[in-house]
Amino acid sequence: MAEMIHLPRSTFERLKMYRKVLEATKKPYISSDEIARFLEINPDLVRKDFSYLNCQGKPRVGYDVEELRKELDDLFGVNNTTNMIIVGANDLARALLSLDFSKAGVKVVAVFDTERENVGKFIGEFAVRELDVLERVIRRFDAEIAALCVSKDRAQATAEFLIEKGIKAVWNFTGVHLDLPEGVIVVEEDLTQSLLTIKHLLKK
């Protein structure tokens, strides 16, 4: 199977959508035409994307759903759990804790906050910790991801502190563009931008 780093970004994004389709189907086999119809894309594009995987379709039968799912799970690292911390003890953190990240191979191991008055309070099953113990927790749980939910004015400084203490990837919910060292993974989650997409589609 091709390493994820060699995949074109557009292919990577589509493979995530294919995985979602496979999770929903109850059939043992599925064709590229069926996937294409569901996602309203060209079947040739589906077949081209699947050429990156060690999973061959059968003529007039399609792809083995279970085999294809395993290939995609391996590609996305779903079978290897990665630990994540949440920084920012607020309603957004509560919303994140209500989600099942195990489907992505991710486990939340701790919640932190920059405000000392929130330390010791509970969000779900987690007692909020102070940032003074961040490095110790990162080492103990081998946490690699931080979901950043702090206020905009604290976003850059907090992100820099997280990287300094050993975090490798930041899932950024602050709405602020982060300027971090090369090699640090940053994924921006801007809900406003998603709404702009919806508004654009409503115009059509």
Swiss-Prot record:
Localization per record: Cytoplasm
The entry's keywords: Cytoplasm, DNA-binding, Repressor, Transcription, Transcription regulation
UniProt cross-references to InterPro entries, sorted A to Z: CoA-bd, NAD(P)-bd_dom_sf, Rex_DNA-bd_C_dom, Tscrpt_rep_Rex, WH-like_DNA-bd_sf, WH_DNA-bd_sf
DNA-binding region(s), residue ranges: 17-53
Cellular component, GO annotation: cytoplasm
Subunit structure: Homodimer.
Name of this chain's protein: Redox-sensing transcriptional repressor Rex 2
Species per Swiss-Prot/TrEMBL record: Thermotoga maritima (strain ATCC 43589 / DSM 3109 / JCM 10099 / NBRC 100826 / MSB8)
